[in-house]
Amino acid sequence: MNIVLVGLMGSGKTAVGRLLAERLGRPFVDTDRLVEADAGRTVADIFAAEGEEGFRRREAEVVARAAAGDNQVIATGGGAVLRTENREALRRTGFVIWLDAEPETLYDRARGQGLHRRPLLSGPDPLGRLRALAAARRPFYAQAAHVRICTDRRSLQDVVAEIMEKLQERGERG
C-alpha cells in the first residue's frame, strides 16, 4: 500500500514525504517533479504555456501512474485532489494523509521557497489567494484523506512521528 500526502502548497508534503520515505525504506515519488520531468519544463512554465487545465491533465496522468505503484511514499501537487479520478485512485491504492496548516503558515513557507515557483500565488495578494484556495479545496482534501494532520508550528520529525503512529494503528509496518 502506498502512503499518499495531500495538502496545500507549503503544508510539508515534499519535506515530510522525503523524511518518511527514508524512515520507512520506501521510494519517494513527488508528482510535481514527475510532471516536470515528463514535460521537460517547470510547473510554472507549464502553467504559463498551457494554463491550469493543461497542467491538471498532465498531473492526472502522473497521479494514475504513481497510484499504480506500490509501497511508495507519494507527495501530490496541492491541486491533485480537485479531480475525482485522482482522489479515487489515491484512496484505492494508498493511505491518504492530509497535511493541513493555517493559510498564514502556508504563506510563510511558500514565501521562503520563492513565490515565483508558485503560479497560483502570482498577483497582488498571495495570502488572500492562499486563503481562498484553502477554503475552496478543504472539502476535496477531506474527501480524499483517511486522516488529517496539522503541521502548524511542528517539526518535520514530529509530523513524521505522528504519521508513523497512524500507520501502526492501521497495522502497517512500513
From Swiss-Prot:
InterPro entries: P-loop_NTPase, Shikimate/glucono_kinase, Shikimate_kinase/TSH1, Shikimate_kinase_CS. ATP binds at G10, S11, G12, K13, T14, A15, R118, R154. Binds 1 Mg(2+) ion per subunit. Pfam families: SKI. Mg(2+) binds at T14. Pathway: Metabolic intermediate biosynthesis; chorismate biosynthesis; chorismate from D-erythrose 4-phosphate and phosphoenolpyruvate: step 5/7. GO terms for molecular function: ATP binding; magnesium ion binding; shikimate kinase activity. CDD domains: SK (cd00464). PROSITE patterns: SHIKIMATE_KINASE. Substrate binds at D32, R56, G78, R137. It is an enzyme of class 2 (transferase). Keywords: Amino-acid biosynthesis, Aromatic amino acid biosynthesis, ATP-binding, Cytoplasm, Kinase, Magnesium, Metal-binding, Nucleotide-binding, Transferase. Its cofactor is Mg(2+). It catalyses: shikimate + ATP = 3-phosphoshikimate + ADP + H(+). GO terms for cellular component: cytosol. It is found in: Cytoplasm. Its main location: cytoplasm. Its EC number is 2.7.1.71. HAMAP family: Shikimate_kinase. Monomer. Belongs to the shikimate kinase family. This is Shikimate kinase. It comes from Symbiobacterium thermophilum (strain DSM 24528 / JCM 14929 / IAM 14863 / T). The lineage of its organism: Bacteria, Bacillati, Bacillota, Clostridia, Eubacteriales. The gene is aroK.
